[in-house]
Amino acid sequence: MTDRPPPEVAVANGNVAVSARNLNKSYGDTVAVRDLSFDARAGEVMGLLGPNGAGKTTTIKMLTTLLPIDTGSATIVGLDVAAQPDAVRRVIGLAGQAAAVDGKLTAHENLEMFGRLYKIPRVERKLRIGHLVERFDMGEFAERVVETYSGGQRRRLDVVASLIAAPPVLFLDEPTTGLDPRSRTELWDEIGELAEQGTAVVLTTQYLEEADRLSDRIVIIDEGVVKASGTSAELKTDLERDVFEVHVTSLEDLGRAVEASERVAPGVSSDTGDLLLQIPLTDGSRQSLAVLRVLDDAGVRVSDFQLRRPTLDDVFLTLTATGGNR
């Protein structure tokens, strides 16, 4: 038995497995997704990153045939989502917010049910269930009913259920929401292994660390519109700015520091808990010296400072807060 999909639907690593072109979806006068396009490749994790209400789940529902596409087109391993929905459903897995496992059944019973729905032969079904239970370390709780599971155990079962038919494409809709850090990290490891074995993974998330760690490519969306796309490194480089972090000694200093810094570098943010200023700079060395001069002139007592490269957090906040496109 193997974790690879049947040869007739297999996609070579690096080739496009999911293609979305100019997708649009509205609910009455509310536009949920506008002219959205991206590709996801076999053997990679494509992260769809955005705040709550950005259109991530709506996009996933359209790609997995759960919602009709208003306009635009999408294909999954060459199958047209709108014209061939039954065929598409046979080659995808879906886990996350809309997982369909039955809380009154055990993990084994749920997986047996899914295997029968996919018409997997009995012997192969038994082997596959045993393999997945072992691989995802579910042996200790596989015979308990699902409603007794912890959040991490439930999420693990959701992912395993989506893999029962060895799909070449896996959609994960915010799969780690509500998990504790340890369970989240364990699930990240499993998702990474799936991609390494050739699965195309489309992951929606609002966790920046998750997108940064897991995703080979990232699409940032806000209000249903693509704001930026590329690798994490490309997005950080394209932001074309450094961040100057300055720690001050008191709240009084912080207030004066914000006012003074804005004269040199607009867009200053502050953290009263850490007595920290974060100042975006387009000319790091020159502007950082200018900031220190104006802070000194304003009588601000500085305890520490550093100039750093932007993080994915900086990219995300810039693009979703200002409405800017890159």
Name these PLM-found stretches.
Residues 1-24, 322-326:
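ABC-family P-loop ATPase nucleotide-binding domain
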Residues 137-138, 265-270, 301-306:
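A short linear hydrophobic-aromatic micro-motif
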Residues 93, 119, 146, 237-240, ...:
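A generic structural signal for secondary-structure junctions
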Residues 15-20, 25-223, 227-228:
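ABC transporter nucleotide-binding domains
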Residues 189-282:
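ABC transporter nucleotide-binding domain
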Residues 2-4, 283-326:
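C-terminal coupling/interaction segments
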Residues 89, 133, 160, 236, ...:
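Conserved protein kinase catalytic domain
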Residues 25, 38, 246-248, 279, ...:
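Preference for bulky hydrophobic residues occupying beta-strand positions
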